[in-house]
């Protein structure tokens, strides 16, 4: 009997993770439909999974980046610059897509009372100030509070410092990196159970009834995100690899986007993207640095959310904007999106910054934020799926482009 049990456990541990996640997804939907009380109860499984990812992700980023930079050999190529360029281009293009879509399909908002407890940044300078302050925070505090900008700055600095250390120290860092990666792999194997709990509890607690009156706005948001995921991001990938991008696009959406959709945190999805990068055979020196960076600056979904909701408020209030203002909004939305990194629903709190460009008072801007929270069940999930899947997508594209260039020069 014990042999049968061990065989079952082994099959579960070695089976297709994507298939198991889809089974968990379907099971979660079925449970929410059959029994609301039981579905709410299994929400604990989802909370445990998300918290486990969030707990291990800061340590993973710190150790991997330090190890990668410390063990980097002179002459090795990491391809970080083209990857960062792809991240920023995607974030800006997303804002432009949202501006055009909002012009073609203008939205009207039924504004609700906003929560007085929400305190958004007062302007774009405050967003930049916050980013700079995050960079110079205490490293232990950065890890404890999952401040990924601070973690990256300290990890990069320590990585360069450890380049001058002994071979034994660098070997220890490499072993520590392997140990943390093994822990992460164990956590990721519980994704099907975690997603089962998340799906069941989310559907049982909210359903989709509350989204009915906001279907048009939600449809525009999701439509823009689908356009980025299925049209513009693939175009950027094709520009890099010069062949059909869709096999890679669908792999990233399936294996990274699905998990990110339910965790609703790019930071929590870092371990998932790391595992996929290893599976794709990408250069470890590249992806251990580029994926954590992407979790902070690859924010196409957040850029769309900020732009669409701001322009919905603008249209509702009858404010006319010119092309120059629309372009400036795209830039502001892109910068604000980077400031929303790693926070579930963070993009909504930066909407008042964009609204301030058009003289919209904070009281009204906060009502727009409230509308965002009402549709946040799907909006935040889709936003995170786009953001996080793009991290691994552009990392893979840049690595493949570099391999192609090396083959041509060989």
Curated annotation (Swiss-Prot):
Record GO biological process: serine transport; threonine transport
UniProtKB keywords: Amino-acid transport, Cell inner membrane, Cell membrane, Membrane, Symport, Transmembrane, Transmembrane helix, Transport
Summary of the function given for this chain in its UniProt record: Involved in the import of serine and threonine into the cell, with the concomitant import of sodium (symport system).
UniProt GO molecular function: neutral L-amino acid:sodium symporter activity
Coiled coil: none
Catalytic activity reported: L-serine(in) + Na(+)(in) = L-serine(out) + Na(+)(out); L-threonine(in) + Na(+)(in) = L-threonine(out) + Na(+)(out)
Membrane-topology annotation of the record: Multi-pass membrane protein
SUPFAM superfamilies, sorted: Proton glutamate symport protein
Signal peptide: none
Gene Ontology cellular-component annotations: plasma membrane
Membrane-spanning parts: 15-35, 49-69, 82-102, 118-138, 142-162, 190-210, 217-237, 299-319, 331-351, 358-378
UniProt subcellular location: Cell inner membrane
Entry keyword annotation includes Membrane: yes
Keyword Signal belongs to the record: no
InterPro entries attached to this UniProt entry: Na-dicarboxylate_symporter, Na:dicarbo_symporter_sf, Ser_Thr_transp_SstT
Protein name per Swiss-Prot or TrEMBL: Serine/threonine transporter SstT
Family according to the record: Belongs to the dicarboxylate/amino acid:cation symporter (DAACS) (TC 2.A.23) family.
